[in-house]
């Protein structure tokens, strides 16, 4: 899969997508360190300054309750931490394993805490960040429960931000419409929530420009979110 799809770029956009090597090297270093950093907490939460919550539930390997093995979704932790630093968003991460999948449909502690944060800090948007396997035919997929968990304007704004950085193809609601976290937030609040599945080919620091443009897309989207107001 190519890093950038030139077919979706105008000439001016192609000129933008030439990142300075020093900037790219610094980005690579930051992502590596953010992924490596760890706490002893089961669930790690950091307060932000804008009413957006970034969530990464699958950052560690764990044995599921049914005995099957779930591998961590590499660099989803670093992506969330990096974007929180850039945008002032809140963040919540499953830092260590207790054998329970936070994205299952049943209510459990992680989702309880997620809802508490949403209510306490008047969060307006949740991005549920996941990693998809490399065989999927998309760079990133947007899951919105078939368009009901977020406004069409929000989804279109995200798609535009991705297109502006040359990220393609972008899938929607197939095969991942949104899991337990997306359904829990949508079913228990009146806010917007999207599940994002980032292809493994775009989460590889061997070629950091792929992840750089993904993060730049999401950063630009978050900074332009219509309901964005300082807390």
Segments predicted by a language model, with ranges:
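N-terminal catalytic or cofactor-binding beta/alpha core of small enzyme domains
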Residues: 1-231
């Amino acid at each position: 899969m190519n890093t950038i799809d030139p077919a979706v770029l105008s000439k001016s956009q192609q000129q933008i997508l030439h990142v300075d090597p020093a900037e790219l090297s610094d980005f690579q270093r930051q992502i590596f360190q953010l992924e490596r950093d760890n706490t002893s907490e089961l669930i790690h939460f950091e307060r932000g300054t804008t009413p957006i919550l970034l969530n990464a539930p699958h950052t560690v390997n764990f044995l599921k309750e049914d005995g099957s093995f779930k591998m961590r979704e590499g660099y989803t932790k670093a992506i969330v931490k990096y974007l929180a630093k850039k945008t002032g968003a809140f963040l919540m991460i499953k830092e260590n394993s207790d054998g329970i999948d936070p994205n299952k449909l049943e209510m459990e502690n992680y989702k309880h805490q997620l809802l508490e944060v949403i209510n306490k800090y008047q969060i307006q948007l949740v991005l549920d960040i996941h990693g998809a396997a490399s065989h999927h035919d998309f760079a990133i997929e947007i899951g919105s429960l078939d368009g009901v968990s977020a406004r069409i304007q929000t989804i279109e704004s995200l798609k535009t931000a991705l297109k502006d950085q040359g990220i393609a193809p972008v899938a929607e609601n197939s095969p991942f419409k949104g899991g337990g976290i997306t359904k829990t937030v949508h079913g228990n609040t009146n806010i917007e929530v999207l599940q994002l599945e980032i292809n493994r080919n775009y989460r590889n620091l061997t070629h950091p420009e792929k992840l750089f443009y993904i993060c730049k897309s999401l950063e630009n989207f978050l900074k332009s979110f219509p309901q964005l107001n300082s807390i």
